[in-house]
Amino acid sequence: VLKAISCGREPTDVELASVSLPEGTVWIDLLDPTSEEIGWTERNLGVRIPSRHDLSEIELSSRLAKEGENMYLSAPVIGAATIEHADLTPAGFIVTPHVLITVRFETLPTFDIVAQRLEHDKTLTTSMAVFVALMEAIVDVVPTYLSTWLLP
């Protein structure tokens, strides 16, 4: 699924027949993307979309890279979680000067929270602002699970 997310609007599906993004798009979210969606994103935004294998690399040197003006990051993110267990899933972040591109392979509640926030928060107008909001949401859920697992 390839979604375009803009400040003040609901997320919209990107038409692969189009060569441009909806006006005001600050975040492209690729959820379990098809090869067509990956190809569209690479062609139209001039980025390299990392594979699931690339995003799953555990070496620190594989987690952060800069290519031209684009910053590539990967991190394990808490996906499905219960009181006893949490699944970690790889997620990728490409911060470009104009748009944040995320790549994930599972539904992640933290991403949904930030997407909903963008509908109402008029301050998230840049790729970096959206990236920071996502990082805050990801970090904010960790103490909840840690306290549940570590405290009797």
Predicted regions and their residues:
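Peripheral, non-transmembrane regulatory/ligand-interaction domains of membrane transport proteins
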Residues: 1-152
